[in-house]
Regions:
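A generic local secondary-structure boundary/capping motif
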Residues: 144-145, 171-172, 183, 208-214
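Short glycine-/polar-rich loops that comprise or flank the Walker A/P-loop
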Residues: 105, 127-128, 150-151, 177-180, ...
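Detector for small/aliphatic-rich hydrophobic stretches
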Residues: 1-84, 89-90, 94-102, 106-109, ...
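Long, charge-dense, solvent-exposed interaction surfaces that engage phosphate-rich ligands
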Residues: 160-168, 172-174, 179-193
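Long, charge-dense
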Residues: 106-164, 168, 173
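Glycine-rich, charge-decorated loop segments at or immediately adjacent to ligand/cofactor-binding or catalytic sites
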Residues: 119-122, 189-202
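C-terminal functional extensions of proteins
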Residues: 199-268
């Protein structure tokens, strides 16, 4: 089960006391999974050896995402120390949460009381590695900033609010300093390094052809667009397929799909 952090009883505390409470909760959680590669063995060069090639550009550690999505991302995952904006169909956010916690890392979800944790579990999420703050109080950005110190992935629901650029820059700097990744959704956040948008584009498995699917939706196709600073926009089609005991991600580029206005109208 996920860990729920209730801040309602802290309303009488000062801002400093609330922050200290969150930090104590972080210290009680397991440490992050290390991403740093093992150091390379030393190499001894003789006097006649050719000069070594220039050192390659430093590769940033990333948090894992569904394999089908990784092909669309410039670094194959979500770079640590960055802020990512996610919008549209909620399945994309759930898939990222599943990949991160399924790999042994920890996540916190702030201000999203209706997040579909059952769907995340079916995608492979380990809910015992998820801390929930459904009601962060009047300043969810401050709560997120504190949780960046100790949590691999922090998901922040902004509830439609717009974060001032100066405040956003301060949180970006903190994420970079702590090596954590912040996902923001349901609001405006200027300065995100990546912006991911997912929209439902079709379905598979209903009653077509020999009663395929026997009247049940077996797959949902998503159109995903990736944009960001110094990143050429990319688009792709992903599919979520029911396997009987879970949900799997795959590429829908070769799948046959068609539009369904009813499915398009379903809430994300």
């Amino acid at each position: 089960m996920p860990v729920s952090v209730d801040l309602e009883g802290l309303e009488g505390l000062s801002r400093t006391e609330r922050i200290e409470f969150l930090r104590r909760r972080i210290r009680s959680s397991p440490a992050r999974v290390a991403d740093a590669p093992a150091p390379a063995a030393p190499v001894t060069l003789t006097a006649t050896a050719p000069a070594p090639d220039p050192a390659p550009a430093r590769v940033r550690p990333v948090l894992p995402v569904p394999e089908a999505l990784s092909a669309l991302l410039p670094e194959g995952g979500l770079a640590r120390g960055t802020v990512v904006s996610v919008s549209g169909a909620g399945s994309l956010l759930l898939g990222i949460l599943a990949s991160v916690t399924g790999s042994g890392r920890h996540a916190a979800v702030i201000g999203l009381p209706r997040l579909g944790l059952l769907a995340a579990s079916e995608m492979g999420a380990h809910l015992q590695r998820v801390a929930l703050v459904p009601d962060p109080g009047p300043d969810p950005v401050e709560v997120a900033a504190v949780l960046l110190d100790g949590i691999d992935l922090v998901v922040l629901g902004l509830g439609g609010m717009s974060v001032p650029p100066s405040r956003a820059r301060a949180v970006v700097a903190r994420a970079r300093n702590k090596g954590a990744t912040l996902i923001v959704t349901d609001g405006r956040w200027d300065g995100a390094e990546l912006r991911l948008d997912a929209r439902i584009r079709g379905y598979g498995g209903l009653g077509s052809g020999a009663r395929t699917g026997h009247g049940r939706v077996r797959a949902v196709h998503l159109g995903v667009e990736v944009q960001g600073r110094a990143v050429r926009p990319r688009t792709g089609r992903l599919t979520l397929t029911s396997t009987g005991d879970g949900v799997e991600w795959g590429s829908a580029d070769s799948a046959v799909s068609h539009q369904d206005p009813v499915l398009e109208a379903l809430p994300s």
